[in-house]
Amino acid sequence: KRQMKVSRYFLPHILALSTSSPFWMGRETGLKSYRSVQWRNFPRTGIPPTFGTYAEYEQIVRSLVRANAIPDASKIWWDQRPHHLYPTLEFRLCDICTRVDEAVCIAAIIQAIVAKLWKLRRDNMTFRVYPLSLIEENKWRAVRYGVSGNLLDLGKETERPARDLIEELIGWFLDDVLDDLGSRAQVEYAFKILDEGTSADRQLATFRETGAMDAVVRRLVEETMEGVRNGPGTGGG
C-alpha cells in the first residue's frame, strides 16, 4: 500500500500528458479532459484515499460487498487501485491517447514511477505522502489546462508550469531507472508531447483552424491509423 500512497502525487502529471477530450456534444468545454469530469459522476471514482495496511483496504471491499453495493473489488473505480485478481497496482485516470506513441510513453512513465519508488524503498528511502486535497487540486488543473497550465509543486508549496514539473519528473526523478528498464526513448517521448501539445491541444487547434468538428474527427482517425499502419515509434511525425 505504500506504493499506492506515494505514487498518487504523480497522477495529475500523468493525466495532463494524456488529455484528449476538450469537446462535449460538439462544443468546446473549456477543459482539456472533459472525460475526467464525466467519469466523476460515477461512484467510487477519483483519487483514492490512503490506507495504513492492505487489510484496511480489504475491509472496505468486504463492507461494500456485504452491503450489496458492489459484487467485488472490480467495481471500485478509483484513479488508482490494487487489481482484484493480480498482484498489480492499476493507474486508471488517463484520458484516451490518440497516438500509439503517446500511449506507450505514458505506460512507460507509469512503469518508471513504480520502479523508482520501489528502488527508494529498497534503499530505505521514501517519497512524501501528500494530502488528498492537494493532489485533487493538481488533478483539477490537469483537467482544465493539460500541460499548458500550472501545477502545484507540493514539496516547495509553490505554483509552477506543468511542463517544468513533468520535465523534472523525467529528467531528474526517473532518470536513474530508465536505462535499466530499457524505456528511455519511450519515456522521453513526453518531451515531444510537452513541445507540441497533447491530443486535446491538437483537436482545439484543428477546430479553430477549420471551424468544423468533422475535421477534428478526421484528424483523430488519422492519428490513430498512424500507429496501426506503422507501429509505435513511427507515428506522430
Question: Which ranges hold each PLM region?
Answer:
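C-terminal accessory/tail domains of diverse enzymes
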Residues: 34-237
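Metal-dependent DNA replication initiation modules
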Residues: 2-48, 52-57
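Glycine-rich, acidic/polar active-site loops that bind/position phosphate-bearing ligands
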Residues: 1-8, 12-15, 114, 168-176
